[in-house]
């Protein structure tokens, strides 16, 4: 982990290093992904089943690709009762938070005979991708499905790669059932994204695809964007801790490592005004590394994308934090809420020493699907808004349109769009003729 004096130049260098992790820098995989998508689009289930056999070493057929109720019942028996209780507790918090994001249609009218409004409609069908492999993330299942359910999406289709035994991890299935998935399919990778985007005989086409995945999934989502909507192109996990001399080095080090353990591309950054804290955090990290299970991954992550930045004052620290625009930000300072108000760019902000980032990953309620790679400057956390669309509503009575029709005709004529002007003019030809001298 590198300790650096904070300057505009050092901030720029760090940003350039972090952006190397972007999926945009994996062009060598794009041809393979494009080929998979093209085959799924053209051959449907045939390609889907073939890729599942090739990549996951599992044979699926139309009768086995969809998870059955019997398989879900079996999953409930396999999941520890205490974990099920925790999943249900987390669901209560996640639903409660997202219900506050609901938007209603609205309409406003005038005595002149006009009505304007906005009609809010949930998307019809959403695809949720859930990664498989050794790591299992039922929390991601909850975070991707719940806002769609709260938004009112009537059809939620989940795909996840099967294990070598042809089954889906029990905790993944239980989380999906609890959250409200309507259909679950045993297929993963770029081929699953293709199936959701284009539809096959077994898997229905969706309107939007959400959920994290490996580089092949990320590139596939990027490729189908426009044909369907997507949530984002997720990058490696990020944490930035903004701290002063009041922070507890033992806690700060633990929080930095909580994200560094995700993978070797994860970034962990401390920006502090205290050199003493910086030194103590380094010592604490060394101590933790002796006992943590994912030591090798953490060491690689910290070597490549770990930084301790020493700032002259808190204003300089905040400025750098806004420039980096981290996925997760913790504020452990005096007057932390005042500092929070100065933060413009962060996916999620955790305030105080007892608001550790994993609290947001699992339990607090806000969504843990967050913008990465500096995109927190213009993107937000996954929310109910991502699963609705808004239609503008316009109603004018004849008298209301007549009052302003000449203004519209003049505007359209100034743009030389005579058909636009005519569309208004034909409705008042008789009246306008009478007005002519």
Model regions: which residues?
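N-terminal Rossmann-like NAD(P)+-binding subdomain of aldehyde/semialdehyde dehydrogenases
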Residues: 1-124
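Alpha-helix C-terminal capping segments
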Residues: 143-154, 177-179, 197-203, 221-223, ...
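Conserved NAD(P)+-binding/catalytic subdomain of aldehyde/semialdehyde dehydrogenases
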Residues: 180-258, 262-267
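A glycine- and small/hydrophobic-rich beta-loop-beta segment
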Residues: 262, 270-346
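C-terminal core of ALDH-fold dehydrogenases
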Residues: 322-437
């Amino acid at each position: 982990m590198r300790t650096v004096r904070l300057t505009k130049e050092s901030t720029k260098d760090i940003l350039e290093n972090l952006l190397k992790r972007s999926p945009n820098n994996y062009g060598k995989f794009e041809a393979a992904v494009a080929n998979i998508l093209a085959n799924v689009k053209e051959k449907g289930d045939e390609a889907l089943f073939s890729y599942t056999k090739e990549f996951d070493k599992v044979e699926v057929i139309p009768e086995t690709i969809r998870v059955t109720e019997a398989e879900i019942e079996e999953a409930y028996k396999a999941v520890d009762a205490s974990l099920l209780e925790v999943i249900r507790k987390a669901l209560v918090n996640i639903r409660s938070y997202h219900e506050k994001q609901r938007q209603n249609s609205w309409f406003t009218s005038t005595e002149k005979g006009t009505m304007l409004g906005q009609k809010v409609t949930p998307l019809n069908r959403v695809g949720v991708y859930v990664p498989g492999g050794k790591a299992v993330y039922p929390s991601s299942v909850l975070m991707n499905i719940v806002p769609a359910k709260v938004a009112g999406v009537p059809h939620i289709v989940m795909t996840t790669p099967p294990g070598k035994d042809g089954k889906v991890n029990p905790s993944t299935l239980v989380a999906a059932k609890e959250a409200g998935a309507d259909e679950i399919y045993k297929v993963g990778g770029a081929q699953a994204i293709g199936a959701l985007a284009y539809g096959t005989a077994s898997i229905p086409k969706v309107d939007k695809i959400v959920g994290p995945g490996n580089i092949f999934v990320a590139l596939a989502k990027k490729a189908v964007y426009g044909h369907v909507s997507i949530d984002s192109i997720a990058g490696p996990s990020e944490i930035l801790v903004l701290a002063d001399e009041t922070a507890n080095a033992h806690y700060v080090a633990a929080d930095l490592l909580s994200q560094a353990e995700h993978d070797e591309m994860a970034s962990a950054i401390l920006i502090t005004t205290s050199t003493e804290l910086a030194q103590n955090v380094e010592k604490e990290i060394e101590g933790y590394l002796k006992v943590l299970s994912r030591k090798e991954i953490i060491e690689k992550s910290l070597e490549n994308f770990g930084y301790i930045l020493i700032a002259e004052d808190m204003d300089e620290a905040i400025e750098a934090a806004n420039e980096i625009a981290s996925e997760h930000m913790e504020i452990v300072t005096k007057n932390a809420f005042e500092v929070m108000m100065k933060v413009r760019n962060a996916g999620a902000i955790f305030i105080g020493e007892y608001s550790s980032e994993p609290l947001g990953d699992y339990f607090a309620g806000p969504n843990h699907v967050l913008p990465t790679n500096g995109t927190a400057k213009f993107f937000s956390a996954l929310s109910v808004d991502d699963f609705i669309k808004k239609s503008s509503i316009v109603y004018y009575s004849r008298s209301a349109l007549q009052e302003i029709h000449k203004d519209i005709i003049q505007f359209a004529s100034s743009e030389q769009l005579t058909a636009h002007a005519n569309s208004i003019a034909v409705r008042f030809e008789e009246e306008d003729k009478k007005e002519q001298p």
